[in-house]
Amino acid sequence: MDIRRTVLWMIFSFSLLLLWNNWQIHNGKPSLFGGPAPEAAATQQPKADANGTAASSTASIPSSPAAAPAAASVPGAAAPAAAKSEQVVITTDVLRLTFDSNGAQLIRAELLKYPSSSQSDKPTVLMDRSADLVYVAQTGVVGAPQGESFPTHQTPFHLVSSERSLTGDTLDVVFEAESGGLKVTKTYTLHRGRYDVDVRHAMANTGGAPLNPALYLQLERDGTDPAGTSSFYHTFTGVAVYSEQDKFQKVTFSDIEKKKGTYIKQADNGWIGIVQHYFATAWIPAQGKQRTNELLQVQQNLYAARTIEAVGTIAPGSSANVDAHLWVGPQDQKAMAAVAPGLELVVDYGWLTIIAKPLFTLMTWLHGLLGNWGWTIVALTVIIKAVFFPLAAASYRSMARMKQVAPRLQALKEKYGDDRQKLNQAMMEMYRTEKINPLGGCLPMVVQIPVFIALYWVLLASVEMRGAPWILWVHDLSVRDPFFILPAIMMATMFLQIKLNPTPPDPVQAKVMMIMPLVFGGMMFFFPAGLVLYWCVNNTLSIAQQWTITRNLERQAAAAANR
């Protein structure tokens, strides 16, 4: 009865299953676990016009929300397509944003502090409107009287402000448009060193009758995975909705297309966003005002996440302001938490959040001391191993005792042959005599598994790892080792661990145990270097612990034999 090997075999088999499942998904086939395969449309971009603009549909312009007075839907806005469009490029110390004067919409966002790769000086392009990616932020006003339309994200605006670069602490980018008796002044306020943009919509009634407008804030994105997405480990790309009532909710593009996504529809708090590995965008309306959230498919492989808020009645000659925040940037948990409640939850650790968050806090504290994320991973692994040393010691002592009685166990198997009942009785008697717990080598490992899985997700999800060097050849801990040195070291440490364990009496099982390092090491060839570094350090410390404990037990046994 070797429970530990059974557990290892289960882990090995499940890992192979996950590897095959990811390969199936990568090749567009259904998941083995019942999830949808990637959409066939995911490789197709939304159709674009001659200017590279994604084709519009009437579905991309909302009707008034239920909270607003009854009003007709905005007519299909194909007419503005003929208007001359001006692209306005605004630069801060951390962002380069491109706005289209048609709709005063954000059509490109470059993150100047985040290179696209460790081999490139070009900034990461998070949002764009091109043949490769459609990902934009839009706003507009609906609820116009019958036959009229208010300015939407397809209405021509004109630029009022003149500054294009941030020279002080803030920069205002101002657009204006008037339609249907409503003048809309849209102001984007950018801040030095920040990824949140203040957005104000000032609405003035220039007509002779009261108006009841409603403002929508929306993000549009195609369903393709971000560049560099790995087939060997999964990260979420899709929509996120947060509210105090239902907390953090994720919705895949596939569920939006099938109209089966679960999210809060009516709320007076929270935000909507689009999440991908390391980065996110989000609209955060003013809290305390009722709004309607909508997730929908605009056209093939193009999806919208929007929130619509009734402004209230604006009398002739009067005006109203609606403020919101737009986040465009990395998943920086500290900065996001300062912008809106729950925004930092885009870094989603799932059911292990209760363990992962303290680990991340400890990791950031260690980085403040060490100044290098690679050495931070090493130090964090050492601390975790130290905390679990008593459990590990119990496990290794149990394995060492099992190794000592292995010859006697083999003799019992030869004596009783196929008589399983007598063999098990004899084994249990031997375990009682030698004070060995067959589960002693397994249970301490099981207790540690949630912590190690949580640490895995912390290292995988943390944008701090992106572009972070360690030493010598490791220039980016978020990508695979370019020379595969760390995976080779990991395989070597796994072989050493197997050699330190009792040899399985079953030859087939022994061969399987020797194959495991090759399989896991092969998988690590495609994993981020930071994760492989963690496993290398963890295995090395485990070997040192196991060797020390085994040697001590052997000395104790030798001393007892000499007495």
UniProtKB/Swiss-Prot annotation:
Membrane topology: Multi-pass membrane protein
Disordered: region residues: 36-70
Example GO BP: protein insertion into membrane
Pfam families for this protein: 60KD_IMP (PF02096), YidC_periplas (PF14849)
Subunit composition and interactions: Interacts with the Sec translocase complex via SecD. Specifically interacts with transmembrane segments of nascent integral membrane proteins during membrane integration.
GO cellular component, one term: plasma membrane
GO molecular function: membrane insertase activity
Low complexity bias (residue ranges): 54-70
Compartment(s) where it occurs, according to its Swiss-Prot or TrEMBL record: Cell inner membrane
Keywords assigned: Cell inner membrane, Cell membrane, Chaperone, Membrane, Protein transport, Transmembrane, Transmembrane helix, Transport
The UniProt record lists the keyword Chaperone: yes
Protein's name in the database: Membrane protein insertase YidC
InterPro entries: Membr_insert_YidC, Membr_insert_YidC_N, YidC/ALB3/OXA1/COX18, YidC/Oxa/ALB_C, YidC_ALB_C, YidC_periplasmic_sf
Source species taxonomy: Bacteria, Pseudomonadati, Pseudomonadota, Betaproteobacteria, Burkholderiales
HAMAP family: YidC_type1 (MF_01810)
